[in-house]
C-alpha cells in the first residue's frame, strides 16, 4: 500500500518552489551572536524572514553543519541557499557553529577541524561492538578529548548543554513559537541532531537527519514521541544508509535500525508503507513511512543516485561547507569566502524538509 500525502507550503500554494521563485527575490542577511557556555565563547547565526514581526511567533529550525564545515558555509554551499526556503515558509533559521581546532601534520599543512560531540567520542567500541574497522582512516583527535582511541574523531565538548542554552537564548531574544522548535543537520550535524533530540526531546517538535546517523548502539527512542525524517543517498560512501562500513572504515547505524529504535515498542513500527508526496513524486527518490496516521511518523527516503551531498543538489559547488560568509570570516579567517547561492535554484531536499516540518508539528 502506498501513502500519498499532499503537502502545501505556507507561503506558496504550489508543490514546488519553482512555482513561486523569482529572479529578484531578496532576503535579509543573517546576524551573528555569541553565547558563553562551559567556559567557551560559542557563535551562532540567525536568519529572520522578511515578514518577521515581534507581535507574532514563528517556528524555528536549528541547523547543524557537518564535519569540517561551518555554520554559514553549510547554508551557502551544502544546501545552496536554505534561507530562501525559510523565507518562503516563514521560518526562523538558527545555525550554530561547533568548536574547532587546527589539524595537520606540519605547519604548512593545516586545516580547520570542526565537529560535534554526537556520542561523547574517544573510544574504540560502542555498546554493540567496534565502530570502525581495523584499518580505518585516522582522524585528528580534538584536544579537549585528551585521547581518542582508534575510532574517535568527534568533539568532546558539551554540545548538548550548548544547544540547550542556545534554544533558551533564541527564545528570549526572538519571537519564537517554542512548541515549534525543529532540529536538523547534515552529516555530523545530523548525528548531533539525533543526539540532542534524544537527550532533550521535550524541546523539539520534529527532527530531520540528512546524510548522517549515529554509530551502532547509540540509536534511541526519545522520551517524547517525535516525527522523524531521514534522507540519505543510495551511493553515499561516507555514511552508508545500510549500516555497512564507510569508505573510511567507520560504521554508522542503518536507517532501518534508527527507525526501529525511534519507534520502540509502538505497534505501528512494524507497519511500514511506501510513501510519496507532491515533491518526491517527480524525483528519483524512494520513501517509506512507519507509524503513519500518528503524530510521530518516521519517514525514510533513499535517493538512489545520491552520494554524500544535500539531496537535489548537483554537488558541483562542493558539499562540505568549508567556506564562510563575510559575517563569519573574522572568527574563522583561515576559511575561504563562500559564493552567494542562486536564489532561483530548486532542490527537492530543501522543499521536503520544510514540508515535513510544516505538516508534522509534534505533540
Regions found by a protein language model. Name each.
Residues 37-45, 55-182, 195, 199, ...:
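Serine-hydrolase catalytic machinery in alpha/beta-hydrolase-like enzymes
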Residues 20-60, 73-92, 155, 181-208, ...:
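A domain-start/cap signature at the N-terminus of enzymes
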Residues 141-151, 263-363:
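Alpha/beta-hydrolase-fold serine-hydrolase catalytic core, especially in secreted/extracellular enzymes
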Residues 1-7:
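Bacterial N-terminal signal peptides that target proteins for export
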Residues 64-69, 168-174, 186-193, 197-198, ...:
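Cell-envelope and extracellular/periplasmic
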Residues 51-52, 67-69, 99-102, 106, ...:
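Acidic glycine-/aspartate-rich tracts in secreted/extracellular proteins
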Residues 8-15:
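Bacterial N-terminal signal peptides
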Residues 87, 205-295, 299-308:
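The feature captures the conserved acid-bearing segment of alpha/beta-hydrolase catalytic domains
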Amino acid at each position: 500500500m502506498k501513502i500519498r500525502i499532499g503537502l502545501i507550503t505556507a507561503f506558496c500554494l504550489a508543490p514546488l518552489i519553482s512555482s513561486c521563485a523569482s529572479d529578484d527575490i531578496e532576503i535579509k542577511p543573517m546576524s551573528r551572536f555569541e553565547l558563553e557556555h562551559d567556559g567557551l565563547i560559542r557563535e551562532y547565526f540567525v536568519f529572520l524572514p522578511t515578514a518577521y514581526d515581534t507581535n507574532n511567533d514563528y517556528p524555528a529550525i536549528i541547523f547543524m553543519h557537518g564535519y569540517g564545515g561551518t555554520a554559514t558555509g553549510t547554508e551557502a554551499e551544502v544546501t545552496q541557499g536554505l534561507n530562501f526556503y525559510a523565507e518562503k515558509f516563514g521560518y526562523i533559521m538558527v545555525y550554530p557553529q561547533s568548536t574547532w581546532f587546527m589539524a595537520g601534520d606540519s605547519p604548512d599543512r593545516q586545516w580547520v577541524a570542526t565537529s560535534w560531540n554526537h556520542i561523547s567520542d574517544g573510544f574504540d567500541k560502542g555498546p554493540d561492538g567496534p565502530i570502525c574497522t581495523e584499518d580505518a582512516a585516522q582522524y585528528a583527535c580534538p584536544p579537549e578529548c585528551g585521547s581518542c582511541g582508534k575510532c574517535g574523531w568527534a568533539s568532546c565538548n558539551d554540545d548538548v548543554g550548548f544547544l540547550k542554552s542556545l534554544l533558551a537564548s533564541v527564545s528570549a531574544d526572538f519571537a519564537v513559537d517554542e512548541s515549534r522548535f525543529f532540529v536538523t543537520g547534515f552529516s555530523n550535524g545530523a548525528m548531533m541532531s539525533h543526539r540532542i533530540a534524544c537527550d532533550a526531546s521535550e524541546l523539539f517538535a520534529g527532527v530531520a537527519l540528512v546524510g548522517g546517523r549515529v554509530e551502532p548502539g547509540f540509536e534511541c527512542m526519545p522520551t517524547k514521541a517525535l516525527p522523524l525524517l531521514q534522507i540519505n543517498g543510495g551511493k553515499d560512501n561516507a555514511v552508508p544508509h545500510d549500516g555497512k562500513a564507510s569508505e573510511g572504515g567507520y560504521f554508522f547505524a542503518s536507517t532501518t535500525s534508527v527507525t526501529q529504535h525511534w519507534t520502540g515498542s509502538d505497534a505501528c513500527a512494524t507497519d511500514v508503507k511506501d510513501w510519496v508526496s507532491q515533491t518526491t513524486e517527480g524525483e528519483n527518490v524512494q520513501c517509506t513511512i512507519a507509524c503513519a496516521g500518528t503524530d510521530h511518523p518516521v519517514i525514510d527516503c533513499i535517493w538512489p543516485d545520491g552520494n554524500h551531498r544535500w539531496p537535489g543538489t548537483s554537488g558541483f559547488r562542493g558539499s562540505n561547507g568549508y567556506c564562510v560568509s563575510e559575517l563569519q570570516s573574522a572568527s574563522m579567517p583561515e576559511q575561504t569566502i563562500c559564493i552567494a547561492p542562486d536564489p532561483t535554484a530548486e532542490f527537492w531536499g530543501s522543499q521536503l524538509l520544510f514540508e515535513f516540518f510544516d505538516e508534522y508539528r509534534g505533540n
